[in-house]
Amino acid sequence: MGEKTGRTGKLARSDKRFLFWSVAVLALLIFSLLAPHLASHDPYEINLSLVTAPPGSEYWMGNDYVGRCIFCRLLHGAARSIFAAVLVVMLSFVIGTLIGTVCGYAGGRIDIIVMRLVDAVQAFPNLIFSISVAAMLGSGLKNCIIAMVITGWTQYARLARTKVLDIKKKTYVRAARVSGMS
């Protein structure tokens, strides 16, 4: 285990591109988490006297066509995007793992029906399917998250099911069943 960690650390130190992008992603995460403290203006505040104002000391990236601070909008947008991404991954993981575990453990008709549903969802590219579902649900961050979770849980379900089926075949599980402990 320590050997793998050593190799990963060595890769991180030797590969300049990896190091650059790691620092860039870390900086983006920090800036987006600190958005409420870094943004000096309300990102939704309309100021018609500052329409398309150039960048300056007060408005670092200037203003848009209705006078809103572009830098503040960028920070708040990044924070919302990262929140949505983390939420989609967490929900997809929890839902997919639960469904996959139940299917792998129960087997039979439940497993067959759910895995055919997984096959049907995975037959379409995730992005196109998510956009289609979001179009049916309507606009908004909540509906976008729901659409992405609907397409994202399938990978976790398939992986969890495979692991459960693998563990069910292990000798110690069979021995526990034979001895009446299961």
Task: Name each model feature, range by range.
Residues M1-H41, L117:
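N-terminal signal-anchor/first transmembrane alpha helix
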